[in-house]
Design a protein with these regions (language model features):
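Extracytoplasmic beta-rich ectodomain segments of secreted or membrane-anchored proteins
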Residues: 157-212
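Hydrophobic alpha-helical segments and helix pairs
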Residues: 122-165
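C-terminal motif of bacterial Sec signal peptides marking the signal peptidase cleavage site
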Residues: 11-16
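Short, surface-exposed secondary-structure edge patches
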Residues: 62, 128, 180-184
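Acidic, serine/threonine-rich low-complexity disordered tracts
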Residues: 17-127, 193-299
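Sec-dependent N-terminal signal peptides
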Residues: 1-9
Length: 299
């Protein structure tokens, strides 16, 4: 059937699959990107515009960590999808929540991540994730703190379902990060970050960041996010056809705490949600989705 469950713009990393010939992927029911190998995905460049430079004193916001800086942090993600086709019963296609403890180590190329024991309330995925201990990931970073590439190298025995879950979690985190402006700013500063989120539907994501408070190198930043499709057509994966986009509304907000001496946020969360309506141009079947994604950082 043409209708396929995907969270547009949030599962693009995991849905850029091969030709579907891997029997292990079929058994797991999920086929991640780059099966069995390390994969690196470039992240679209962010364009940053300062709206208000804020109060004096002002200074450039730049990461100031040294090579070899180590940070222990935990990433938590939760991705919920409710879907209805025509007048059929609403179905739940949510991804299980993940808690990902990790150790980040900086080097000249960015940030290397070693994952600890990933946990989830879903029993089947929890069992699959036991083999993922020691999985490595990484971010390549710009001088403005933006993430320019995402790497994932799973532990050898990681199943496809576990790998796909990790890919989606990190992809969500990448597009909930913040890039700093290229000019001095102070408390109260507002800047806008515009970025394309790739996928079956390319999204124009605009993040408005507000510097709420600063204590030395520690920054409290408010984030407000909106996403709009760049096209009115959704190209389904694996050449399954297209859907017309009839309605699309995704927005959200949150607060994060950043230490300029560390590579990743030390605290905070951001939630994005909304609804999407698609129509099959061949059959006039209508697909409705309600989506909510939560990403948080902490100890």
């Amino acid at each position: 059937m043409l209708m396929v469950v995907l969270a547009v713009g949030l599962t693009a990393f995991g849905s850029g699959c091969g030709d579907g010939g891997d029997s292990g992927a079929e058994a797991d029911g999920t086929e991640p990107l780059g099966i069995g190998n390390e994969v690196t995905v470039p992240i679209a460049a962010a364009m940053v515009t300062t709206v208000d430079p804020g109060e004096e004193p002002r200074s450039l916001l730049r990461p100031s960590y040294y090579n070899g800086t180590i940070q222990a942090v935990t990433l938590r993600t939760d991705h919920r999808i409710q879907q209805q086709i025509d007048s059929q019963q609403v179905r739940d296609f949510s991804s299980p929540a993940l808690t990902i403890p990790m150790t980040a180590t900086t080097d000249s190329g960015g940030v290397e991540l070693t994952l600890g024991s990933v946990t989830t309330p879903d029993p089947a995925l929890s069992e699959a994730l036991t083999a993922a201990d020691g999985t490595h990931a990484g971010f390549e970073m710009s001088e403005l703190g933006g993430i320019t590439a995402l790497r994932l190298a799973p532990a050898p025995d990681t199943s496809n379902s576990a790998r796909a879950a990790l890919e989606q979690a990190f992809y969500q985190a990448v597009y909930r990060s913040v890039t700093f402006p290229d000019e001095p700013v102070g408390v109260g500063a507002v800047w806008r970050v515009q970025q394309t989120v790739g996928g079956g539907v390319d999204l124009d994501q605009v993040t408005t960041a507000t510097l709420v408070a600063r204590d030395g190198g520690r920054l409290s930043i408010r984030l407000d996010v909106t996403q709009t499709p760049k096209s009115n057509i959704w190209d389904l994966p694996n050449e399954a056809g297209t859907l017309d986009i009839e309605d699309y509304a995704m927005q959200g907000s949150g607060d994060i705490t950043v230490d300029l001496g560390l590579p990743l946020p030390i605290a905070g969360s951001i939630s994005i949600g909304g609804h999407q309506v698609y129509r099959d141009p061949r059959t006039s079947t209508v697909l409705r989705q309600a989506i909510e994604t939560n990403v948080s950082w902490g100890g």
